[in-house]
Amino acid sequence: MKKLALILSCAATLAAPLAFAQTKWDLPTGYATNTFQTENVQQFADDVAKATGGKLKITVHAGASLYKMPEIKRAVQSGQTQAGEFILSAYANENPLFGVDSIPFLATSYSAAQKLYTASKPATEKLLADQGLKLLFSVPWPGQSLYSGKPMKTMDDFKGTKMRAYNPATTRIAQLVKAQPVTIQLAELGQALATGA
């Protein structure tokens, strides 16, 4: 299953021309500094600085240091931050198209993820534009895994356990295996795993 992480920004902000002086943007992400997701976001910020000759400087705020992941979309929509990175499938309850890339086994390779992205991009961009957001780029995620402190040999082993759910699809998977879906922000996941919370 491939997920597409999305960078979004206020359309009005992007439409405004950059001033001759340096313009500074904040870009919050809920992911830690040395993760795949944040490294991609930092590369984007570096590329923008280079492409604009330093006229637009984007500061990446990793590890939910500026906003927690569930707050980022609203912070961008309300203009509290100029851009933000979040997983769009977390908003599949707003529109099923936002979760198309989290349907289990629909896109099981990078090439399949690219085809799915290409097919869904125009409709996704329109939905986001209707919400005052602009898609800047998407990144295919590597495969997902489940981690447990004890071996999970049968479906019965999941009964009553807590399972991190970050979108409607992972919530449904937890329900199907009779686990308890819980919301744990990525920045807090290490501690939750260590304490068994």
Label every PLM stretch briefly.
Residues D26-Q43, G63-K68:
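Extracytoplasmic "Venus flytrap"
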Residues K24, G54-K57, M152-D157:
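Short, surface-exposed connector motifs at secondary-structure boundaries
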Residues M1-L4:
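Positively charged n-region of N-terminal signal peptides that target proteins for export
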